[in-house]
Amino acid sequence: MFKALLLENQDGKTVPTLTRLAESQLPEGEVRVAVAYSSINYKDGLAITGKGKIVRQWPLVPGIDFAGTVLESADSRYQSGDKVVLTGWGVGEGHWGGMAEQARVKGDWLVPLPAGLDERQAMCIGTAGLTAMLCVLALEEAGITPDSGEVLVTGAAGGVGATSVALLAALGYQVAALTGRPEEQGAMLTALGASRIVPRSELLVPAKPLEKQLWAAAIDTVGSQVLAKLLAQMNYGGAVAACGLAGGFDLPTSVMPFILRNVRLQGVDSVMCPFERRQLAWQRLARNLPASFFEQAVTEIGLEQVVEAAEAITQGQIAGRTLVKL
């Protein structure tokens, strides 16, 4: 038997219960893992509180990412005792996730934990950090180098944004960090490596088809008006990695930046990212993230506190990462 947080649907309402489950109750999969850490993401908050239509299977153990040790495996890539990390693939939505002492998943969904990272550090990175690394890889593959010019990161105080700032700065890029709370978040972003802070209000003005060229590249987590504005401000040959829609899913832009300035807009998805790409990204995270990244605000909680933390994250009351220690 092992401890787990189980979500059930009772008369249309999501009811979370701390319970004990038997191994036989775990869903099908090739690899059974002893979970060491999970984390609370915004999507987890929506699932656990029932505020968003996230859960696709009842009952469900939530938790969209986790790290731990293989207990048994029918996949030749993994042996008992191996350290692994999981993000994405609909885990914690349509397949039982990381908010339990054990999980059983497909081998294809796991990635071996790279040398230099432990389970706690892996969850400090989590889904957000993997997405950030995939964005950085996209910019590198578009030919953007530290000599290309300034790189803008939007939503810089969020999980993806903050990790993007840290990675780019560690790789030698000049980073401008866009945030809606410059006074509150400026010091943290500077500590992560941002060379300057840009108030979000500067990019909320409606964009002309083309504007003054300001950015060599950008990582955008916001979408909508902000993405349209920065596209109009990209340098000739610039590249934007777009991975979020915190500001909306619309894009009020024109073809002008693409056909007159040779700008590249690259979409980045981490949920269905193939195994080889994930493995590369995790290896790069282990190599490129500075030690100082793991010293930022991190709160550790137990399963007993997850429901309270889920409510808090949906109300914007959580700063930094919240890890769940199993």
Listing of model-derived features with the role each one plays in the protein:
Residues 169-225, 283:
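Adenosine-nucleotide cofactor-binding segment
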Residues 225-291:
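Glycine-rich phosphate-binding loop and adjacent beta-alpha segment
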Residues 129-130, 155-162, 223:
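Glycine-rich NAD(P) Rossmann-fold beta1-alpha1 loop
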Residues 279-326:
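C-terminal hydrophobic helical "lid"/dimerization subdomain
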Residues 65, 82-83, 102, 150, ...:
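Residue-level marker of beta-strand positions
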Residues 99, 180-188, 249-255:
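Short, glycine/polar-rich helix-capping loops at beta-to-alpha or helix-loop-helix junctions
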Residues 87-152:
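NAD(P)H dinucleotide-binding glycine-rich loop of Rossmann-like/cofactor-binding domains
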Residues 24-40, 51-91:
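Glycine-rich beta-strand-centered segment in the early N-terminal region that forms part
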